[in-house]
Amino acid sequence: MASGATVTPRVHSWVMTFVNVGTLGAVPGKRDLLVQILTRRSADLEAAGCLLYEVGINDEQPDTVFVAELWTTVDAHQSSLQLASVQAAIQEARPLLSGEMGGYRFEVIGSPLRD
């Protein structure tokens, strides 16, 4: 691409989904319990507009849980936080969290995997 060229994203129906990718610090030794809560099957999340919710670990960071979420909209994500099932999971997980959190939030504008 020439210097100074402008990139114009192609707009499609799947565009403008909302992504939240984050890390959750777990109390030492409690990571696996936290993962159990986060991976519990939830039809409520899907109904609320969650397209993807992946939970992962990395043995090099034994007290960290990684989460990648894809939502239909930022509003769908925010609304999901008010669901009774989500509030219950948050309350259950809270004692397992160290308070260390990080991550990124962004709206998707394209992908090389789709037209």
Where do the language-model regions lie?
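Long, charge-enriched, surface-exposed interaction segments in small proteins/subunits
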Residues: 84-89, 93
